[in-house]
Every structure is written in structure tokens, then in C-alpha cells.
Amino acid sequence: MNLAVIGHPIAHSLSPQLHEQWLRASGLFGRYEAIDATPDQLPALFAAMREGDWDGFNVTIPYKEVVVRYLDDLDEAAKHAGAVNTVYKRDGRLIGTNTDGAGLVQALMPYTDFRGHVLIVGAGGAARGIVQALPTRDVTIVNRTVERAKALADTFGVVYTTFDEMDVSRYDVIIQTTSVGMDERSTPLSLEGLRQNTVVCDIIYRPLVTPMLQEAKSRGANIVTGVAMFVGQGALSFEKWTGVKPDETVGKKLIEGLLEE
């Protein structure tokens, strides 16, 4: 089985280690590569997949929207998310899906039943994929650009707020989807008033524990790192390609170990 992740740049990707571990554990012979592709190389890659050279692709930045033109169809998750992170074959056709949102929701299930209020921080592609996958519409969007928050909220029939009006004590689950925190110093919002046992998730996994998660933990929250979404979406992709449900616990330990090195 020949699998790969396509992006640019891609050297930082931990997907090969994760998926090759799952291939070995499942008794499947195969490989998973990281392909640093320029835009002009994309047509040949998808042509090769049609010809049987590849069994599946993950797609990452900056190609999640671009690859749509090379596919035969998108499933509902990809259509709603407006982006593709996984390509698989069915009856010779190339199908695009998006497992980011569903992967995160699945990873959060041990912590919440989603019966309370959910706050989504950010209004970009990641936020869109997560909102469409949530099993609730009791959702509030907050974003630095209010117009984008309103547009996303209107798309999914949820509400939006501003950082000035927001009260974090209202929410049972907070999901941070922006890049704020990658610098290991910044935090996207104030957690003043955060209730104990609130579930706080940051989809960033470098650093493993962001400044926001550090503060949330100090306030008694249940924190979930970006590894949860990374492994969750990867598991759903792996299952699409192989029909095998991989061990996410083992995958999570592997990735956390690599990030802590």
C-alpha cells in the first residue's frame, strides 16, 4: 500500500511516522511518504494515483483547496469544510474528504458529550471543518475579524460574538483554531472567569502545550492538545484507505514522544 502526504513545505510533518506505525501494527505491507510538491507537480501526482501508483493521499498546507480540481468528487464533509485533507479511491474514482473536524470531535468525546455551549476561536478553514462536524449547533464563533465570524456563523446557523463582548464563563467547551500560540508566548483570548472543568482544546501541537492551555490548566480546566486532532484525523484517513481502524492511543503516545524530544 502506497500512501503519502502532499504539501509545501513538508519536512516538519509527523504523518509518516504515525501512519507507518499503524501500517506495521495492522500487518499491512506499505509505505507512507512526505512529498514536498510544487504546484506544477500536482497534476502528475494525481494522474499517478489514478494509474495505481498511489492508494491514498493526505493533503496539507497550502493545497487543501487547490487539489479539488484534480478529483472526481467530494463527500459532504469536504463540501461543507470547503477543503480536502484526504484523497481516496472508490471504483477507480478519486474522492476528496475532510477528516479534520470529525477527527477532533471523535478525540473530544471522552471529555464532553457536547450538550453544553461551545466556543470556537477563529473563523478560517480549520474552524469551518470543525463547526460542520460538531454534533451540536449551540456554538458561538469569535474571531479578530468580526465579519469573518459572522459569515461562518451564518453559514452554519450558529451565533457569533466579539472578544470584547465574550464571557468565557458561559462555555463548556472552548476550541482554539488559529495559529496564535505557535510562538510559545501569545494567547488568543483572556481566560479570566474560566470555570473549572471546562474542556479547552488548542489544535496547535507545536508547542505541545500552548500558553493558552497552560493558563487553562492552571485554572482547573480539562485541556486537550492539538495531538488529539492530528491523530484523530489521521485515524479516519487511515480507515478510509485500508478499512482498518487504527489504535489512536498508541498513535497519540508516539506523536507526543516525538514532540517532546
Swiss-Prot record:
GO molecular function terms attached to this record: NADP binding; shikimate 3-dehydrogenase (NADP+) activity
Name of the top EC class for this enzyme: oxidoreductase
Domain of life where this protein originates: Bacteria
Record bears the keyword RNA-binding: no
Catalytic activity as recorded in UniProt: shikimate + NADP(+) = 3-dehydroshikimate + NADPH + H(+)
Active site: K64
GO BP terms, alphabetized: amino acid biosynthetic process; aromatic amino acid family biosynthetic process; chorismate biosynthetic process; shikimate metabolic process
Record carries keyword Flavoprotein: no
List of residues binding shikimate: S13, L14, S15, T60, N85, D100, Y205
Protein EC: 1.1.1.25
Pathway participation: Metabolic intermediate biosynthesis; chorismate biosynthesis; chorismate from D-erythrose 4-phosphate and phosphoenolpyruvate: step 4/7
Keywords on record: Amino-acid biosynthesis, Aromatic amino acid biosynthesis, NADP, Oxidoreductase
Family matches, as InterPro entries: Aminoacid_DH-like_N_sf, NAD(P)-bd_dom_sf, SDH_C, Shikimate_DH, Shikimate_DH-bd_N, Shikimate_DH_fam, Shikm_DH/Glu-tRNA_Rdtase
Sites where the protein binds NADP(+): E76, G122, A123, G124, G125, A126, N143, R144, T145, V146, E147, R148, I203, G226
Any single Gene Ontology cellular-component annotation: cytosol
NCBIfam families in the record: aroE
Family note: Belongs to the shikimate dehydrogenase family.
Role this protein plays: Involved in the biosynthesis of the chorismate, which leads to the biosynthesis of aromatic amino acids. Catalyzes the reversible NADPH linked reduction of 3-dehydroshikimate (DHSA) to yield shikimate (SA).
UniProt subunit comment: Homodimer.
UniProt name for this protein: Shikimate dehydrogenase (NADP(+))
Source organism: Exiguobacterium sp. (strain ATCC BAA-1283 / AT1b)
Gene, per the UniProt record: aroE
